[in-house]
Amino acid sequence: MDLLERLGLGGRRVLILHHDDLGLTHAQNGAYQALGLPTGSVMVPGAWASGVKGEDLGVHLVLTSEWPAPRMRPLTEGESLRDEAGYFPESLEALWRKARAEEVERELKAQIQAAAKLFSPTHLDAHQGAVLRPDLAEVYLRLAEAYRLVPLVPESLEGLGVPPPFLPELERLLYETPFPQVRFLDPYGLPPEERLGFYLDLAHLPPGLYYLVHHSALPTPEGRALPDWPTREADYFALSHPEVRRVLAEFHPLTWRAVREALF
């Protein structure tokens, strides 16, 4: 029996609406509180991780730090996870070229354990999909099982930028995992002016389990220190729009906490 059948939601349109990058800035945290949508994940190495309070929070596992500021450092001493200045690598390519799986495992454990001191985590996901190198994906799924947290597992790898050499092993892991798989939706790459239309078009989706990630941030000087601030503000304004709220109300809302209770 699949997850939706187990939850009595078979044949329904079900949506996990997920707020990424919490803990990164006050603007990100403020948008989470202002929108009143419960599900999101926290970047534990972020400066403002301790300021996030909510009912359905996960760990947004960090292995890269791509912005000029703020930069983030590992919680552990793994040399393969640091650049010359001691920060996480700036790109997935740099991470995947250098990272040792045993050091990644220690770092992810440290982030999960630190998160548990701040809130009661329900789920795991990874910033920039950093665990899509197959050996790191195995670590990610193993830690999810060990800590009884639900991992984000996409139904398809299409459009996620996975290097072709990684695909066969990742597809095997997807096939074998006991965790539920979701239809992954992420408007991050769309121009900000197209964001509202993207959310309104959700009205046309067929039944299924959807995971929609957004990066909403308040319009503040601090939030605008990030180079991608227009896309973050576009998410915030779109999700505040009454017509978008009407479209979202047509879905059955689901939290990772409810999924976790069903699985564990």
Curated annotation (Swiss-Prot):
Q: Gene3D superfamilies of this UniProt entry?
A: Glycoside hydrolase/deacetylase (3.20.20.370)
- In this chain, Mg(2+) is annotated as bound at D21, H60, H127
Respond yes or no to whether keyword Magnesium is given for this record. Answer: yes
CDD domains, from UniProt?
Answer: YdjC_TTHB029_like (cd10802)
> What's the EC number here?
3.5.1.-
Task: Report which residue ranges the record marks as coiled coil.
Answer: none
GO BP of this protein: carbohydrate metabolic process
The protein's UniProt keywords, in alphabetical order, are: Carbohydrate metabolism, Hydrolase, Magnesium, Metal-binding, Plasmid
Q: What residues form the catalytic site here?
A: D20, H215
Q: Which cofactors is this protein said to need? A: Mg(2+)
Give this protein's Gene Ontology molecular function annotations: hydrolase activity; magnesium ion binding
The domain of life for this entry's organism is: Bacteria
Q: Which family does it belong to?
A: Belongs to the YdjC deacetylase family.
The record describes its quaternary structure and partners as: Homodimer.
Please explain the role this protein plays, according to its UniProt record.
Probably catalyzes the deacetylation of acetylated carbohydrates an important step in the degradation of oligosaccharides.
Q: What is this protein called?
A: Carbohydrate deacetylase
Whose protein is this, by species? Thermus thermophilus (strain ATCC 27634 / DSM 579 / HB8)
